[in-house]
Amino acid sequence: MRRRIVAGNWKMNGSKDLVKQLVGAVREQSGSVGEDVEVVIIPPAIYLDQVAEQGGGRITTGAQNVSQWQSGAYTGEISAEMARDMGCGYVLVGHSERRQLFGETDSVAAAKVEQVLLSGLVAVLCVGETLAEREADQAEAVVAEQVRSGLSVVADGQWSRVVVAYEPVWAIGTGKTATADDAQAMHSEIRKVLDGMNAPANEISVLYGGSVKADNAAALFAEPDIDGGLIGGASLKAEEFISICRSFPAGV
């Protein structure tokens, strides 16, 4: 069975006080989440140690970004090895904000995926189309190319450490959400692309992101090819985040 994952991406938000309050609350309520659901918090790197400590072993941590280089004179960068040294289990790669604001390309994403996998961590490749691309009927082609390029470096024995997160750019932080049917359709296409790459497509978790909230998570997570969520703003509210983590259908 594929891993069920709910990952909270805090982006550039947080403080020491928030870590204590929010992570502590999530930890205390994590017992009400299904045993087959992995709860991941992805804070700014400076708070990784604190989140891990507050998580008490019940929460996995992840890094929002790592360098495409292994080490060296790259001021301000954090390597995948450093993320592992900090106890991370996951690393986001190619988030749309990295692509749009910092000019990261598919080739940069591929280089980062390679570093993450070499470090023994799980790479979460983020893919998604803009509104203009969707309206031009290019959504599937754009996402397929992002998947193929970003995961072109994955070797046969590394697919168990790959997760894909589909985040339509037009839905991130806008309050707009793809319908469950639309999200399922794209997740199914992503799985077909993975299958075409000779990856074990039915074993790879594909998450949905883009204004996921407690009131729409259940409908999304009920779809057969949606294995969880990459959560933005809602992950900064303990009750809502835990509610999302509880939104998987029972007995599946």
UniProtKB/Swiss-Prot annotation:
The protein's matches in SUPFAM superfamilies, at most eight in alphabetical order, are given as: Triosephosphate isomerase (TIM)
The top EC class is isomerase
Role summary: Involved in the gluconeogenesis. Catalyzes stereospecifically the conversion of dihydroxyacetone phosphate (DHAP) to D-glyceraldehyde-3-phosphate (G3P).
Is Isomerase set as a keyword in this record? yes
Q: Name one GO cellular component term.
A: cytosol
Residues forming the catalytic site: H95, E167
Q: Which Gene3D superfamilies match?
A: Aldolase class I (3.20.20.70)
> InterPro entries in the record, alphabetically?
Aldolase_TIM, TIM_sf, TrioseP_Isoase_bac/euk, Triosephosphate_isomerase, Triosephosphate_isomerase_AS
UniProt GO BP: gluconeogenesis; glyceraldehyde-3-phosphate biosynthetic process; glycerol catabolic process; glycolytic process
Keywords from the named record: Cytoplasm, Gluconeogenesis, Glycolysis, Isomerase
Its transmembrane ranges are: none
Give the UniProt family note: Belongs to the triosephosphate isomerase family.
Q: Which domain of life is it from?
A: Bacteria
What pathway is it annotated to? Carbohydrate biosynthesis; gluconeogenesis; Carbohydrate degradation; glycolysis; D-glyceraldehyde 3-phosphate from glycerone phosphate: step 1/1
What PANTHER family does UniProt report for this protein, alphabetically?
TRIOSEPHOSPHATE ISOMERASE (PTHR21139:SF42)
Q: Which gene produces this protein?
A: tpiA
Q: What is this protein called?
A: Triosephosphate isomerase
**Oligomeric form and interacting partners:** Homodimer.
